[in-house]
Regions:
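Repeat-associated, polar segments at repeat-unit boundaries in modular proteins
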Residues: 255-267
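Catalytic domains of cell-wall/extracellular-matrix polysaccharide-remodeling enzymes
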Residues: 87-168
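Short secondary-structure boundary/hinge segments and terminal tails
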Residues: 65-66, 135-136, 266
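Flexible, glycine-rich phosphate/dinucleotide-binding loops
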Residues: 33-34, 63, 134, 158, ...
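Extracytoplasmic Gram-positive cell-surface binding/anchoring modules and repeats
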Residues: 240-251
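Functionally critical loop-and-helix segments that line ligand-binding/catalytic clefts
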Residues: 1-19, 142-227
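Substrate-binding cleft of extracellular glycoside hydrolase catalytic domains
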Residues: 1-123
Length: 267
């Protein structure tokens, strides 16, 4: 059993999910220590309404800025905490720390990022990397933390649609367990007029939900668990930061955010 997965970012803007021929959607949430995808919630709320499996990823070293892994993971969690436990999460690691080749320093960075996510949320993220990186470094410490692999490997850069058995070089992915294969960045599928990243998830909806629901404790703020006042404070800070616009637009977005939660809890 496999799921056909698209992953999207702000490049796709306010993409409409319902018409698209896919089984699951992963959306970029944050990047580095200062980038938030303003379209993320719009996409995820559609997935929740459609009862479609959803995921969320953080892009490491956004804009080429090399930050402390705990700083980046805290930024990811703090901006996306309301989704943890509902969606699969992943770390997207593509930029080498030294700007050239990947070393054990990159492995350590990923490990520390992931460990902080686990510590604060209980959720074990997937790791997204190019398949070629697996043989360049020793990833055992990451894999031994029960981190599943979402790897990218393309046959070419031609347009393609959904494939049940996409090309792969046949090399082992040890020490990882492969969870997902992104096989093109030029996917063309029904319901969207443009290129999309296409992946196959090797499992069913229940398997997806196990990755999403792996946490067993409230999300902490790095110390004590977050209570309702902390959530309200975080929400208010988002409002003050302009994430909900101004005037009538702000009122509508705040109302909609609360109403979406009410609708979700009343199901």
């Amino acid at each position: 059993m496999t799921l056909r997965v698209i992953d999207v970012s702000a490049n796709q803007g306010l993409i409409q999910i319902a018409p698209i021929d896919c089984d699951a959607v992963i959306v970029k949430g944050t990047g580095g220590d200062n980038y938030v995808n303003d379209c993320c919630d719009f996409v995820l709320q559609q997935c929740f309404k459609l009862n479609k499996p959803a995921g969320l990823y953080h892009y490491a070293h956004e804009f080429g800025n090399i930050n402390d892994p705990v700083v980046e993971s805290n930024f990811f969690i703090d901006n996306c905490k309301f989704y943890f436990g509902k969606v699969l999460v992943a770390l997207d690691y593509e930029v080498a720390i030294n700007g050239r080749n990947y070393t054990q320093q990159d492995v350590d960075w990923c490990y520390n990022f992931i460990q902080n996510v686990i510590k604060r949320t209980g959720v074990v993220p997937l790791l997204y990397i190019s398949k070629s990186l697996i043989s360049e470094c020793d990833w055992s410490k990451v894999a031994n933390a029960n981190v599943g692999l979402w790897y990218a490997q393309y046959a070419d850069n031609n347009h393609t649609g959904w494939l049940s058995d996409p090309w792969d070089d046949g090399k082992a992915t040890n020490p990882f367990t492969t969870v997902m294969h992104q096989y093109t960045g030029h996917g063309r599928i029904n319901g969207y007029n443009g290129d999309l990243d296409l992946s196959l998830f090797y499992g069913d909806v229940n398997a997806w939900n196990k990755y999403a629901n792996s946490h067993d404790k409230p999300i902490s703020n790095g110390g004590d668990n977050v209570n309702s006042n902390d959530y309200l404070t975080a929400f208010a800070k988002d409002v003050l930061a302009g994430k909900y616009g101004n005037g009538a637009e702000r009122k509508e977005k705040i109302y909609q955010a609360v109403q979406n939660k009410v609708n979700e809890l009343s199901k």
